[in-house]
């Protein structure tokens, strides 16, 4: 499976696995959870968000010439009126420095590949947990919507990132402020 972004310039700087630091926001560097354990925890989080994981497939992405271990997570959600929707979370682990020339380099590279995917899945699970809390605290937020699939096979998030869903900024009010939403304050 090869993934090639439409606009490689949109890719942010991605650190190598060995350079990912906790103080830069990366988590899961020292997780001892297996890929299967993390898959099960992600499935449970998707369930708590109202979806059902239907597929987990390991593979490899190629992004800007770098091979990155990854996975595709597919799920279904059903709306209140009973209509079903499919979603997909594409997970690309961090690239890693490949060991060459050593007798155990194949095993070392396999371990690094697994570690990269474990760390990526750990962060996806953390993100889904955070989304669940946000869904509880923010009325109208639907955590699984960005990964719903369109008729073209792209997710809503991919379309948005490509600029197809970006709306123009609203016009400023008379005092120069941009109002995107309004709410009513209720006195206790």
Regions found by a protein language model. Give the residues of each.
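Terminal, regulation- and interaction-focused segments at domain boundaries
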Residues: 1-44
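Intrinsically disordered, low-complexity regulatory regions enriched in serine/threonine/proline
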Residues: 1-3, 7, 89-188
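Short, flexible coil/linker segments at or flanking structured domains
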Residues: 21, 42-44, 63, 105, ...
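Compact, well-ordered interaction domains used in eukaryotic information-processing assemblies
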Residues: 34-88
